[in-house]
UniProtKB/Swiss-Prot annotation:
Gene Ontology MF terms: DNA binding; DNA-directed RNA polymerase activity
Reaction(s) catalysed (UniProt annotation): RNA(n) + a ribonucleoside 5'-triphosphate = RNA(n+1) + diphosphate
Taxonomic lineage from the root: Archaea, Methanobacteriati, Methanobacteriota, Methanomada group, Methanobacteria
Protein name in the entry: DNA-directed RNA polymerase subunit Rpo1C
InterPro entries per UniProt: DNA-dir_RpoC_beta_prime (IPR045867), RNA_pol_Rpb1_5 (IPR007081), RPO1C (IPR012757)
Native organism: Methanothermobacter thermautotrophicus (strain Winter)
Region ranges (DNA-directed RNA polymerase subunit Rpo1C): 69-449
Source organism superkingdom: Archaea
UniProt record, GO biological process: DNA-templated transcription
GO cellular component terms, A-Z: cytoplasm; DNA-directed RNA polymerase complex
Function: DNA-dependent RNA polymerase (RNAP) catalyzes the transcription of DNA into RNA using the four ribonucleoside triphosphates as substrates. Forms part of the jaw domain.
NCBIfam families for the chain: RNA_pol_rpoA2
The EC number(s) this enzyme carries: 2.7.7.6
Keyword line: Cytoplasm, DNA-binding, DNA-directed RNA polymerase, Nucleotidyltransferase, Transcription, Transferase
Length: 449
């Protein structure tokens, strides 16, 4: 541990990073600089990161002393847990170590605490042969009967509509490619999150703006078959747009256009009334700024920092933007998270979105049920729906597939291919009347002669 602390101290002093702000910067720096390939050393660096987060208010020598003391307490608990032949997750060991400091536990009291935690931990574990899938399905499905069918305003952002309740839960478990109301929450890092002017400029750059939004006057001249538009300099300033950028966009889109300061005069390709009206619509709807797939943008102040909420989502594009906090910025589009950040991030998004959807309706579901659903949806390395086009339609058992939906199709295809069902699952054994490999049926009795 002293070696790791020394490396972190050296790295932070060379790069001017004050402990512990932020921990991720110098931990990532060490991992890159030292090319750490030893898994134990990686675990040690992650542990150090968590310890630093818990001692965020300290700096320099005080921080290093606190880190060393906590690490020694964790080692003490680890040794005791090992002697008891218990298997605790790292977080639980760290919580026991924190209890030693908080309550000043003696060795005997620590021994008693570990014994009690072991009993509670083993009691909380799932029994072998338990039908966890059935319990999870019931635990998530039953509260769904109490959920609303309506689309509400997003909590705290009245200007944005976001799908909530049962429709949102269905979107999540169906793994819809196109969700009804995609939205992003964009956070900023450093001092920029407190800079309203900076955030508003970013918001105006993201927000979809059309030429119609910056016009003072607009008219169709039937006499000389032209469309005339006058730009409003005040509106252009309010939206933090550049006059030259607007003109460049207009000249690129329309071939027949005359520009006289703020007056724009357009001519249709053919001198007909129909073409003139089509041209007028095209002029008004010309997009002069914004990001693909993003419409309305709302800026809100949350806990002293400025946050952008959007209608529509383009996470990959926003991550390329300077000043955006890539750790906290997120979207409710699970497939986009999978594309940009990977399958583990998509799994976490499924858990977070499902849990939040339930909690917004005042419903509480044990997160382990939701985690099991998310694990099944992402087990193959891509996000799959729970239905005939996903998990249920891709089961190894012919009878299990046929029992869900499209029975005839599955039986016909299996017959053509000559598939064999080895009857290893639950549903197929229920269908043919055999004991199921679950609970008491998961063990066999051997009679000695």
């Amino acid at each position: 541990m002293q070696d790791v602390i020394k490396k972190i101290e050296d790295y932070s002093s060379r790069n001017g990073i004050m402990l512990p702000n932020p921990v991720t910067e110098y931990v990532a720096g060490i991992a890159e600089e030292e090319k750490l390939k030893d898994p134990e050393l990686h675990d040690l660096v992650r542990l150090f990161s968590r310890i630093c987060e818990r001692n965020r208010g300290l700096e320099g020598e005080e921080l290093l002393k606190a880190v060393e003391d906590e690490y020694l307490r964790i080692l003490k608990v680890r040794e005791l847990v090992k002697r008891k032949r218990a298997k605790f997750p790292p977080r639980l060991i760290e919580e026991i170590a924190e209890a030693i400091k908080r309550h000043g536990l003696s060795d005997d009291e620590l021994d008693e605490l570990v014994r009690g935690v072991r009993r509670a931990y083993e009691r909380a574990m799932v029994e072998a042969g338990e039908a966890v899938g059935t319990v999870a399905a019931q635990s998530v499905g039953e509260p769904g009967t109490q959920m609303t069918m309506r689309t509400f305003h997003y909590a705290g952002v009245a200007e944005l509509n976001v799908t909530l309740g049962l429709p949102r839960l269905i979107e999540i478990v169906d793994a819809r490619k196109k969700i009804s109301t995609p939205t992003m929450s964009i956070y900023f890092e450093g001092d920029r999150k407190y800079d309203e002017e900076f955030v508003r400029k970013k918001a105006n750059k993201i927000c979809k703006s059309t030429l119609n939004d910056v016009l003072k006057n607009f008219s169709i001249q039937y006499a000389d078959m032209s469309v005339e538009a006058e730009l409003d300099e005040e509106k252009i300033r309010e939206k933090h747009l550049e006059y030259d950028d607007i003109i460049a966009k207009v000249e690129k889109t329309f071939k027949k256009v005359e520009i006289d300061n703020n007056i724009l005069r357009f001519e249709p390709p053919k001198p007909t009334i129909r073409e003139l009206r089509l041209l007028a619509d095209k002029v008004r709807k010309l997009q002069i700024s914004g990001v693909k797939n993003i419409g309305k943008v709302v800026i809100r102040k949350e806990d002293d920092e400025w946050v952008i909420h959007t209608e529509g989502s383009n996470l990959g594009d926003r991550f390329k933007e300077e000043g955006v906090d890539k750790v906290r910025t997120t979207t409710n589009d699970i497939h986009e998270i999978e594309t940009v950040l990977g399958i583990e991030a998509a799994r976490n998004a499924i858990i977070h979105e499902a849990k939040r959807t339930m909690e917004e309706q005042g419903l509480t579901v044990d997160i382990r049920h939701i985690m099991l659903v998310a694990d099944m949806m992402t087990a193959d390395g891509s996000v799959k729906s729970i239905g005939r086009h996903g998990i249920s339609g891709e089961k190894a058992s012919v009878l299990a597939r046929a029992s869900f939906e499209e029975t005839g199709k599955h039986l016909l295809r299996a017959s053509i291919r000559g598939e064999v069902d080895h009857l290893t699952g639950i549903i197929e054994n229920i269908i043919i009347g055999q004991p199921i490999p679950l609970g008491t049926g998961s063990v066999s009795v051997i009679m000695k002669k």
